[in-house]
A protein has these predicted regions:
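Positively charged n-region of N-terminal signal peptides that target proteins for export
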Residues: 1-4
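Scaffold/interface architecture of coatomer-like assemblies
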Residues: 21-285
Length: 285
């Protein structure tokens, strides 16, 4: 059954409209321990074999002692959000269903996933559950509420013992959102989930594309641009694998204020690798 998100997230919408991301961070942490998901690549290839001694973490400019790093040891919660506006053909819908099925096949038994659909309305098509998962794409809509859907994809309670990842697919042409991209960027700063935006095919105006890039970057994700839906399965699988094989770097903030916004930068000491990591986190007063 498809459940309209507006029906059970009204409080969240009111909070967002009031600018509430400042009031509560959903960043994943236990007591004083901060966890940063860090993707390390050499070219397009993930880099393995790194230890805590290879990483340099700066919290508000202060170098932090790294407690430990790990990979692939924590179950995933994956949100797949799909633009089903009228620009999608029947063939496109079949390709999207196939991409969701391939993601389902790649999940481990301990992982979970949900599927959200959006046009002018944002709906939860498949509730968060263990694999296998599937989705019915028999209905499409006219408008496209890209930023509304992105906001709802980002809103989820922090899970210390699980990693959260959003795969967000759209053509990027927003026609009917109630909220704008600036609120999506601010929400991303405080959200727990890393977010990869897949533009297929990209119709995003430059301003919208820039906002989507900012949302992804704030969370340690990326934007992938495809020419057609036939490339979607591989893009989904690659993005999911990149996230799964990223490092969880843990540290206890030292020498910085406990509350407020914390800028975080991550480097690998030994080599100039390409690194994606969230840009910071917030601790309520």
């Amino acid at each position: 059954m498809i459940r309209p998100m507006f029906a059970f997230t009204g409080a969240a919408w009111l909070a967002l409209a009031a600018g509430a991301p400042h009031a509560q961070s959903v960043f994943r942490a236990r007591t004083d321990v901060v966890v940063i998901d860090v993707a390390v690549h050499e070219g397009r290839k993930p880099v393995g074999g790194l230890t805590k001694d290879d990483f340099e973490i700066r919290d508000n400019g202060v170098v932090q002692p790294v407690l430990d790093v790990s990979r692939e040891s924590v179950p995933l919660d994956v949100t797949i959000t799909i633009d089903i506006s009228g620009s999608m053909t029947r063939k496109d819908r079949e390709l999207v269903k196939g991409a969701v099925a391939q993601v389902s096949d790649s999940l481990k038994p301990s992982d979970r996933a949900r599927v959200m659909l959006f046009h002018t309305v944002v709906s939860e098509a498949t509730a968060l559950s263990h694999p296998p998962i599937s989705v019915d794409l028999s209905t499409i809509g006219l408008g496209t509420a890209v930023f509304d859907a992105l906001l709802l994809s980002l809103i989820s309670p922090p899970m210390v013992d699980r990693r959260q990842f959003v795969l967000f697919m759209t053509d990027g042409q927003d026609t009917s959102s109630s909220f704008d991209g600036s609120l999506a960027i601010e929400t991303a700063r405080h959200a727990s989930a890393a977010t990869t935006v897949v533009l297929v095919p990209s119709r995003a105006p430059d301003q919208t594309r820039g906002m989507l890039v900012s949302v992804a970057a704030q969370t340690g994700g990326e934007v992938i641009e495809l020419k057609g839906h036939d490339q979607l399965s591989q893009a989904f699988l690659t993005a999911l694998d990149n996230f799964r094989t990223s490092y969880m770097v843990r540290y206890i903030p030292t020498g910085v204020a406990k509350t407020g916004w914390h800028d975080v930068t991550v480097q690998v000491k030994s080599k100039n690798y390409s690194i994606r990591a969230r840009r910071g986190y917030s601790v309520p007063n």
